[in-house]
Amino acid sequence: MIAADVLLPACLALFGIVSGLLWKVPNVGRLDALLAQRVNQAHLPGWADRFLGVLRIAGTTLFFAAVLVLAAIARPSWALGLAAAAIAAEAIAKLLKVTIRRPRPSAADSGIMLRLTRVPIDSSFPSADAMRAAFLSGLTAAGGMPGWAVLAAMAAAVGVGFGRVRSGAHYPLDVWAGLLIGFGAVLAWAGTL
């Protein structure tokens, strides 16, 4: 029998996926695209875009792997379960990307400018960067970090997601799904502790 402290976070991730797929409903999809366009075209000060560019590091695969290795070194008893949860979250995101195949906003809408130096080659749904950042923010809570650090990590995860929409790499519902997959996966792992 699966314990509630594992099942409920898994349901959170599933809810993120299903609600994220609401972009397939025409009116919701139009609203998602409009919001992506508005965020992408908003006049922000240069420092804000530079900050979002730096913050994006928190969603990269290399940063994700480095933090997971450091966590496993700090708490060896976490290593196997943490690795399994992280691999499961990555696999879910990748499987959804190859199955759903949602085009990137910058490729689907000429009004959206790609604000990245490297053009992403995979599909848009879900945002794996948002998933990784959310996973790591949940890890700060599970690791017993002070409340301010947990809040800062959660704000960083939301910032990574906002930056992905701002950059033209994702729609808001891609980010929403990625955040909930990441939170769900790390909370499911934490439920096994």
Please place each PLM-identified region on the residue numbering.
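Alpha-helical transmembrane segments of multi-pass membrane proteins
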Residues: 20, 85-97, 156-160, 164, ...
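Alpha-helical transmembrane segments of integral membrane proteins
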Residues: 7-11, 52, 77-85, 148-152, ...
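Structural signal for the C-terminal ends of transmembrane alpha-helices
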Residues: 22-24, 70-78, 143, 190-192
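N-terminal transmembrane-helix/juxtamembrane module of multi-pass inner/ER membrane proteins
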Residues: 1-63, 97-120
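Membrane-embedded catalytic cores of phosphoryl/pyrophosphoryl-handling enzymes
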Residues: 110-193
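Interfacial segments of alpha-helical transmembrane regions
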Residues: 64-92
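Core segments of transmembrane alpha-helices
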Residues: 57-67, 129-138
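Membrane-water interface at transmembrane helix exits
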Residues: 36, 72, 93-101, 141, ...
